[in-house]
Structure formats: structure tokens, C-alpha cells
Regions:
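Short coil/turn segments at secondary-structure boundaries
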Residues: 206-211, 260-264, 278, 301
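The feature captures two recurrent sequence modes
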Residues: 66-256, 351-413
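Extended, Lys/Arg-enriched charged tracts that mediate electrostatic binding to polyanionic substrates
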Residues: 193, 270, 274-306
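Intein-associated homing endonuclease modules of the LAGLIDADG/DOD-type, together
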Residues: 32, 144, 148, 292-294
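Non-catalytic, well-ordered alpha-helical scaffold segments
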Residues: 27, 190, 194, 244-247, ...
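A conserved regulatory-domain signal marking ACT and ACT-like small-molecule sensing domains
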Residues: 1-96
Length: 413
């Protein structure tokens, strides 16, 4: 453990508190900080000691002479926020959900349904117990859950040919063929994850609820998409106040099987690593207006590629009418746009192409103030910090493989 030296930081406070032993207790506590606008720079959780909490605190006070401002995993925390350096590090925060999970708000459609709440706890337990490298447990969905899925699947599939982007429509039949996408069947995350890995290297990881923007985007840097496994309440199949398996599998998954879109999504994730908090908010806004609610030009048409649109029958129709305002996607302008969460978007941003958007995100990422650049090493599934000559040599060696590409092109000419 590292204790930072005495500094003059203002408004910084360290605190220790205990929680009841129940699923969702941490999420409840963190929600209080969020409601009061308090920024948490570091969180650690430990199993409760056998001694009373007061005794533990008294012991710490006796041993530590200076005021403790923050604890970090290493000295780099003094200058930049911590970020995962390898794919196993995702285990450290995957269960730090901010809302929902098995705990539902009073206005949630399933709040008064004890059967639904018990079912949500089953899904939450799967996510909480999952660790990288394990197979995602298979789930036997109930007939009621399949009926809800079937309603959403049937309605959306009728719109995809005329409203979804070409990349989505190209992949969707493949998901039906290889991953069990059917009106009467809810596909399994493990099957889909393996298929995505064979297409683009992306994989799914079960999550109990909403992660912070920083944690969620960090997963994308490793080509990991944190996916819910539960389904919306059956009383209103066409509405959900949170991401569910319909949103993940019908909206997100098809595009993660497209190489260009997969690279675009990873670029947003890489840009978030070590970024200051204010830039995380900006990147989250870019993500919202692209990966979630993006439109793109395809020939003379405008099509949807955002998962929030591709999983919402009503908004998918609305977005391609003359009711909303359409603007060209420019990250510097997009980050300034406010957006509603519980209603249709009044403004959408239109991309020229995934490649064009990827380059624009790269250029914007270069403006983020951080003392180094990063790259993802797909062989070791780790993040390389490019801050020394050896790392630059390694990068140069990988670039040298472009010669193989040039040679292949010459032989094909």
C-alpha cells in the first residue's frame, strides 16, 4: 500500500465506512456521493475485520502521523488516474456498478414484482462471480422472458432492412445462423462472445448493472463489452429504463462483429485511459452520440448504427423522420451537446463513415492532456504506455510488418 506524502490539496477527504452484507449495498452508498456531486478519486473494498470498525480506525490513527489524502496502486496515480494495464485488471472494477443490478428504483416496471426481482438477483450473482478467462454461464430463460424477447425481436427485425446500416444488416443473418438469434430463443452470451472473438477480437463480459463511464470505456480499450444478461420486465416489452439483453444483443453485438466499427469503438476506449475526469465526460458524450445513437451516410440514405436506436422500435422510426435535427459528426462540437436520457433525442449526429469517425476520434484523442500515448498489444492483451525508448522500439518493430502488406499487394497487382 502506498500512502501519498502530505500535500496541499484542498477539498480532498479520505473516509472509511462499513456496509451491510448484501448485494447492491455498495451501489446504494455510491449513489449518495453521486447525488451530492462528490467526485471519488479512489475506492477500495475489503472484507470486514474481526475487530470493531472503531478499533481499526483508532489503530490507523495511532500509526499514521500525517493526513491521508488518497491511496493508489502505484506512484503514477499522483499525475494521472489509474487505468487497467492488462485484461485481467477488468476484474478489479467490473462489479462496481452505479445503479440497478438486483436493486431496482421505485419507478422501475419490475419494482413490485417479487419474481422479477428474484430473477434479477440470479443474474447479478452470475456477474459478481465471473472472472476473466472463465466461460460465461449459460442461462435457461423462462417462457415469459422468451416471450418478451420475441416481441422485441419481431418488431425490430421488420425495420432493420430499411432503417439499419449495411454493416448491421450484413451481420444479423450470420448471428441467426451461428449464435441462435431467433424469435423464440434468447441467445447465450458465451456463444456470442466466441463468435465475436472470431470476427474482430471483441468479447462479452457479464455485468450486473451500469458501470461508471470511465470503467465502461476502459473495457472497450481491451475490446471487451460489458453486457447485461437480464431482460426487461414483460409488462412493457417496448420500454426499458436501463440496458438489458435486448439492447445489448440486438443493438450492440451486430456492429461489434464489423472490423471497422470494432476499431472505432476501441479508439474511444483507448482515448479514455488516463484521461482527466472532465475529458471522460466528453468522451462519454461522444460515445452516446455515436455507439448509442449514431446515424451514418450510406449512399443517398441515412441509416442508424447506434445501439440505442437499433434496439428501440419507436426511436428507430422517429430518428429517420424530419422531426429531429441532424448535424455532422465533429467530436469538438459533439462533446458540447446535452442530451436527454429518458426520451427521444432531439439531435442526432451523422457520420460520413466509420473510418471517417475513427480518424476524427483519433485526432480528438491527441488533444487530451496526458503525459504519454498508449497502444493496445493484442498478443499480450495489455496496454503499452509509450513513454520510453524500448516501448517505441517495440512499436517500430510492429510497424515494420507493413512491409509484408506491401509485398502481398505487389504480388496481387
Amino acid at each position: 500500500m502506498y500512502l501519498e506524502e502530505q500535500t496541499n490539496k484542498s477539498g480532498v477527504l479520505s473516509c472509511i465506512f462499513s456496509l451491510n452484507e448484501e448485494v447492491g449495498s455498495l451501489a446504494k452508498a455510491l449513489r449518495l456521493f453521486e447525488e451530492k456531486g462528490i467526485n471519488l478519486t479512489h475506492i477500495e473494498s475489503h472484507v470486514s475485520c474481526s475487530k470493531a470498525l472503531d478499533e481499526v480506525i483508532d489503530g490507523l490513527r495511532a500509526e499514521i502521523t500525517g493526513q491521508v489524502h488518497e491511496m493508489s496502486r502505484n506512484k503514477i496515480k499522483d499525475t494521472v488516474p489509474w487505468f487497467p494495464s492488462n485484461i485481467q485488471d477488468l476484474d478489479r472494477f467490473a462489479n462496481q456498478i452505479l445503479s440497478y443490478g438486483s436493486e431496482l428504483d421505485a419507478d422501475h416496471p419490475g419494482f413490485t414484482d417479487p419474481v422479477y426481482r428474484a430473477r434479477r438477483k440470479e443474474f447479478a450473482d452470475i456477474a459478481y462471480n465471473y472472472r476473466h478467462g472463465q466461460s460465461i454461464p449459460y442461462v435457461e430463460y423462462t417462457e415469459a422472458e422468451k416471450a418478451t424477447w420475441g416481441t422485441v425481436f419481431r418488431e425490430l427485425k421488420t425495420l432493420y432492412p430499411t432503417h439499419a446500416c449495411h454493416e448491421h444488416n450484413r451481420v444479423f443473418p450470420l448471428l441467426e445462423e451461428y449464435c441462435g438469434y431467433r424469435e423464440d430463443n434468447i441467445p447465450q452470451l458465451e456463444d456470442i462472445s466466441r463468435y465475436l472473438q472470431s470476427c474482430t477480437g471483441f468479447r462479452l463480459r457479464p455485468v450486473a448493472g451500469l458501470l461508471s463511464s470511465r470503467d465502461f470505456l476502459a473495457g472497450l480499450a481491451f475490446r471487451v463489452f460489458h453486457s447485461t444478461q437480464y431482460i426487461r420486465h414483460g409488462s412493457n416489452p417496448m420500454y426499458t429504463p436501463e440496458p438489458d439483453i435486448c439492447h445489448e444483443l440486438l443493438g450492440h453485438v451486430p456492429l461489434f462483429a464489423d472490423p471497422s466499427f470494432a476499431q472505432f469503438s476501441q479508439e474511444i476506449g483507448l482515448a479514455s485511459l488516463a484521461a482527466p475526469d472532465e475529458y471522460i465526460e466528453k468522451l462519454a458524450t461522444v460515445y452516446w452520440f455515436t455507439v448509442e445513437f449514431g446515424l451514418c451516410k450510406q449512399g443517398n440514405d441515412i441509416r442508424a448504427y447506434g445501439a440505442g436506436l437499433l434496439s428501440s422500435f419507436g426511436e428507430l422510426q422517429y430518428a429517420l423522420t424530419d422531426k429531429p435535427k441532424l448535424l455532422p459528426f465533429e467530436p469538438e462540437k459533439t462533446i458540447l451537446q446535452k442530451y436527454p436520457i429518458t426520451e427521444f433525442q432531439p439531435i442526432y449526429f451523422v457520420a460520413e463513415s466509420f473510418e471517417d469517425s475513427k480518424e476524427k476520434v483519433r485526432k480528438y484523442a491527441a488533444t487530451i492532456p496526458r503525459p504519454f500515448s498508449v497502444r493496445y498489444n493484442a498478443y499480450t492483451q495489455s496496454i503499452e504506455v509509450l513513454d520510453n525508448t524500448q516501448q517505441l522500439r517495440n512499436l517500430a518493430n510492429s510497424i515494420s510488418e507493413v512491409g509484408i502488406l506491401c509485398n502481398a499487394l505487389q504480388k496481387m497487382a
